[in-house]
Design a protein with these regions (language model features):
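Conserved class I S-adenosyl-L-methionine
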Residues: 1-36
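Nucleotide donor/acceptor-binding cores
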Residues: 38-39, 100
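Conserved Class I S-adenosyl-L-methionine
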Residues: 48, 165-166, 170-254
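A short acidic, Gly/Pro-enriched loop at the edge of an enzyme's catalytic core
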Residues: 95-105
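Short catalytic micro-motifs in class I SAM-dependent methyltransferases
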Residues: 109-110, 137
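A short, conserved alpha-helix within the catalytic core of class I
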Residues: 113-123
Length: 254
């Protein structure tokens, strides 16, 4: 199975433990793009809605495309009652959007799974003139707030982290958007903070695609070790987050 499809195997855990983005980020995005009733928005790969509520609640005409059938079903369960909610279960790379065009397209950490040329060229085509492409991700630092605990956690990684499918993402260059015709590229940072108890931390780690594919006997020993080391070292893990928002725009005359 492709790593980008692994998340679909844990829809309930993914919904409960994947982090959300800062309210300040969404307010900036909504104001910047003028998202309101009458605007048409596409979210690429919403998962189970980690970045959906603030946009959907503007009253815009919200559309989403989700690759995972179980994640798609969870989205339908959570948001199906909204009259402005529309979602399809398909692969953005191959999906035919026909004549649909959008005022904004956004993606929360999903666009990195799409080849850069496809991601930028296809979103550019799907945007109306002047339309906004927004891309967001979270960078988390749990070393600085928990240095001793961090060192002990790394020993568990050294011993048990042996995923069957290596994680090879990270090469997507958000700042390459202008090479595909986009203009006004911007980057904005919004701080955040999370605290997790041992069980929450283990459940959160269990939503990482490369952690899901750790085989036994390593997997159980790894997660039990994480739970034990956190419980014995203060009982919590602190994350200092930086929510990153990349913005760019299709020219008005294209």
């Amino acid at each position: 199975m492709e790593l980008r499809k692994i998340f679909d195997t844990i829809p309930e855990q993914f919904d409960r433990f994947r982090p959300r983005y800062s309210p300040e980020l969404f307010q900036y995005l909504i104001d910047h793009a003028g998202i309101a009733p009458g605007k048409t928005v596409l979210e690429i790969g919403p998962g189970t809605g980690q970045a959906t509520d603030p946009i959907l609640e503007t009253g815009c005409d919200y559309h989403a495309i989700e690759l995972g059938e179980h994640l798609y079903a969870k989205m339908k369960e959570k948001y199906g009652a909204f009259t402005n909610f529309h979602i399809v279960n398909d692969d953005f790379i191959t999906h035919d959007f026909a004549l649909q065009r959008f005022d904004m397209i956004y993606s929360a950490a999903t666009i990195q799974w799409i080849p850069e040329q496809v991601a930028f060229a296809k979103t550019f085509e799907l945007l109306k003139p002047g339309g906004i492409l927004a891309m967001m991700l979270t960078r988390s630092d749990y070393k600085t707030p928990n240095e001793d605990l961090y060192a002990k956690i790394q020993k568990l990684y050294d011993q048990y982290y042996k995923p069957e499918i290596p994680y090879a993402q990270g090469g997507f260059r958000y700042d390459h958007a202008p090479e595909y015709g986009y203009v006004d590229f911007q980057q904005h940072h919004f701080p955040g903070r999370r605290e997790m108890n041992p069980d929450e931390y283990v459940s959160y780690c269990g939503t990482h695609c490369d952690h899901i594919v750790i085989p036994e006997p390593y997997k159980t020993a790894f997660f039990e070790g994480l739970r034990k080391v956190v419980a014995e070292n203060g009982g919590k893990v602190v994350f200092e987050d930086t929510h990153v928002l990349y913005l760019t725009r299709k020219p008005d005359d294209r």
